[in-house]
A protein has these predicted regions:
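Terminal (and in a subset, N-terminal) low-complexity or junction segments at the ends
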Residues: 1-182, 191, 200-591
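Short glycine- and Lys/Arg-enriched binding-loop motifs that mark or flank ligand-binding interfaces
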Residues: 188
Length: 591
């Protein structure tokens, strides 16, 4: 049949939904070959004139992942109606063809068909998935012009869109103007805060939600647990877990994985394991989360045990799984296991190692003092694989094992690759200082000043009475600053009495030695632990989250603090966990 004849015959001719042809489409589902065969049958039988059948065919072709086939079918539809457009826009947006959803929406407008709330929710979702802020604002104006500005579903979609696009102020304004906010709207706003790194705002809104009597669902909890992970709010994480249990909320794999991640990242890996063991049937993501949880705490043997069990259950590890495995091997010094895992990626699973895997391997060799092997590994990488992150891992190994000559060479290479990254200058300055080349330290510092580069600010958060408190180095913003500083001074004196000796090299090298010790004393994690000791009862474990790697001096000081206060102190820095107890650290000084 010619295309023109086909166009002429695809009209609004109705067909009963329970026809044999419709049932055939339902049975075929999103199977492209089957759909093409059914389309041929429709053409021969004349049933292609049914708008219901054509709409169903379009929806299923989207679900099958063939947007080109969808476009070809749509091209032959004469005078598509609103129902067809809405179904097509929703399916395109739902199955990842967001740009096509916007193009179909434009076609709908040029066809002089009025969009509905059903249209707008799908179009706004497409804008959110594309982070298309400008287009989304235009669609928002269409919403208002068409009188759907107060529709709760459209408003919830707008909240999600603005939040995903980073326009949190606008998202909150839309949210606050909603006459009725259902759980979907609350979830959208809470998720927006969490995904934009504002975990404290997410938690505050969650508490407001509870206060107003809105019952959270599993989606709410997944987001809140992620915020707890971000902030290290273990007590709130306990509360959420208890709420889930007490209210009989079904713990699916997604929620269980969120719990595993939260407990692991907040320092209670045994509780994470309990959640993992309670799963009837986990997926690769849940298994990977448990491997990662053990790895970040330095429990490499346990991480590998989970990895081997996963393979025994015939669950194929993916690239993310191998990042977790290799990281666990690096932090625990499991060199042979790491080598075997890396080799198996290509040989057994057909996976191509990426940047993260290469960084883990260099880090693993470097931590173990195998600098020549790490350097040889780098030399064997292709030009496109020699990214700054790989060299940064090598530089960290040079600093750890005091190979100043190679460290300076690599730091200078990093600066040539990323001249606007202040971290590289700081590392180069440290290498020069450790090598005793103070004139070079001053030179690097001057270059940073000339280029307007500033060292990344370090901060630490501590959860006290279910509230997060943030500190930065030398922070004096807290209302109890004087008491905190007095307590910390006394604490450091007690540590010195027990044998603690400050390590001035950990401070800024442009300072005099006495000034360096003063700067070290008021690092953010020391202020956080002083506040925590002041505000909690004797024997309570303190948990601190730091955005940067803990320095050598603070690592040493916390061992002594754990002795003189008889407390366990858990610190999560940007690399791993450190459990300080009775004068030792779980990392065994291997970080």
């Amino acid at each position: 049949m010619e295309a023109k004849q086909y166009e002429e015959q695809v009209d609004a001719t109705p067909l009963p939904r329970k026809s044999a042809e419709y049932e055939a489409l339902v049975r075929a589902g999103p199977n492209l070959r089957a759909l093409q065969q059914i389309q041929a049958h429709l053409l021969v039988s004349g049933c292609h004139r049914s708008r219901a059948l054509i709409t169903k065919l379009l929806v299923l072709s989207c679900a099958a992942g063939s947007i080109n086939y969808t476009r070809r079918i749509f091209h032959h539809v004469l005078h598509p109606d609103s129902f067809l457009f809405n179904s097509l826009i929703k399916s395109s947006s739902k199955f990842g063809f967001s740009l096509d959803a916007l193009l179909f929406y434009r076609h709908m407008l040029t066809s002089k068909l009025a969009p509905s709330s059903y249209t707008f929710t799908s179009v706004i979702k497409a804008c959110a998935d594309l982070s298309a802020l400008k287009i989304g604002r235009v669609v928002h104006s269409h919403v208002l012009v068409n009188g759907y500005g107060s529709n709760s579903f459209v408003q919830a979609a707008m909240v999600t869109f603005y939040a995903k696009s980073g326009a949190l102020d606008v998202a909150r304004k839309v949210f606050d103007e909603m006459p009725e906010r259902n759980v979907v709207a609350w979830n959208s706003m809470i998720s927006g805060y969490e995904q934009n790194g504002l975990g404290d705002e997410a938690v505050a809104l969650f508490r407001k939600m509870l206060k107003l009597g809105v019952r959270p669902d599993s989606t709410t909890f997944v987001t809140v647990l992620s915020a707890c992970s971000q902030l290290g709010l273990l007590d709130l994480g306990y509360w959420v877990h208890d709420y889930i249990i007490n209210h009989g909320i079904h713990v699916n794999v997604i929620l269980a994985t969120a719990l595993i991640n939260m407990f692991s990242r907040c320092g209670n890996v045994s509780r994470a394991r309990a959640v993992f063991d309670s799963l009837d049937e986990g997926n690769v993501i849940a298994w990977t989360a448990m491997i990662n949880g053990y790895g970040m705490h330095g429990y490499g043997v346990q991480a590998m045990e989970i990895f081997h069990r996963m393979k025994a259950y015939r669950l194929a590890p993916n690239n993310v799984t191998f990042v977790a495995v290799l990281s666990a091997c690096a932090h625990a010094g499991l060199i042979n296991e790491g080598r075997q895992a890396f080799a198996s990626m290509r040989q057994k699973y057909g996976l191509v190692p990426g940047v993260e895997h290469h960084v883990c391997m260099v880090d693993m060799f470097g931590r173990a003092g195998l600098l020549s092997e790490a350097y040889q590994f780098i030399k064997e990488l292709g030009p496109q694989e020699l990214v700054p992150a790989v060299w940064t891992a090598m530089l960290g190994a040079c600093k750890m094992h005091k190979n100043f000559e190679l460290g300076v060479e690599i730091a200078e290479r990093l600066i040539s690759l990323e001249p606007e990254n202040p971290g590289h200058y700081v590392l180069l300055s440290n290498m020069y200082a450790l090598a005793g080349k103070m004139d070079r330290v001053e030179s690097v510092r001057n270059v940073m000043i000339q280029r307007g580069l500033r060292k990344r600010v370090g901060y630490s958060t501590i959860d006290v009475n279910n509230n997060p408190y943030l500190f930065s180095m030398g922070d004096k913003s807290h209302p109890e600053t004087n008491e905190i500083y007095r307590y910390l001074d006394e604490l450091i004196w007690r540590c010195k009495e027990a044998g603690y000796v400050p390590i001035p090299e950990s401070a800024m090298h442009e300072l005099e030695e006495e000034e360096r010790e003063f700067a070290l004393r008021y690092h953010s994690e020391k202020l956080a632990v002083a506040f925590g000791l002041m505000k909690t009862t004797h024997g309570m474990t303190l948990r601190i989250v730091k955005n940067l790697k803990i320095c050598e001096d603070c690592h040493s000081a916390f061992k002594f603090i754990s002795i003189v206060t008889n407390r366990e102190i858990i610190i999560r820095d940007k690399l791993r966990f450190h459990h300080f107890k009775e004068g030792s650290c779980s990392c065994l000084d291997y970080w």
